[in-house]
């Protein structure tokens, strides 16, 4: 999908980009406003490539849009918004069993033993279980600023599906199957989203300059140069979500451009990235 520039100059076109490869992440999706707008843009890209609206809607939900948020209610609204947007292009979409990659971030704080003798016997898979539980401590507070290592999360989820047990199960085994296993699968699914790299990452990050508790400790330890405000942390983190030559978009306060608190952020962007568009909003926009 290509729009000719107004000046008529065409410097470079990657003719081999497929629509399904244009994966779009909003790591602070809220109720999904940005995802819904991206859906319409992606729909035009698919239609330009010869897809029907019905097929494109399914492809966008399955392959293109990814969203995360720590707020369960906001995530439910985002889920609903994406599904209704797909439904607007395909009347039977809700009956097709397609689930969007729109997730409420979960944490592992209340999880007990994750390995059951006789049910989980694969050492590599058990190591992933322990990694997930350790990584997702306090993530209802930390959200998507955590970093996750890429692992075989698809294989891990398939492995969990095969841990059904045979014959008579103990109460502990039954509890693992009914409660622990679904949570591990949910953690693996969000780990897969957080570990991936995206051609496009766009968000309206949270604004918070008085950070306290576990979040303050984590930000100080991992994002000290960008800790003046939570939006600054997310600005940096979003860049880490992007593939090389990918695009990041933000709706943030404009103070990062001027005051000393955000000097390290400005230096990082200027020295390592390229700004294609910069719009200074009216103060009343916030």
Where are these regions (language model features)?
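Signature of N6-adenine DNA methyltransferases within the class I
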Residues: 36, 43, 70, 75, ...
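Short N-terminal helix-initiation segments at or just after the protein's N-terminus
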Residues: 7-13, 45-50, 135-146, 240-241
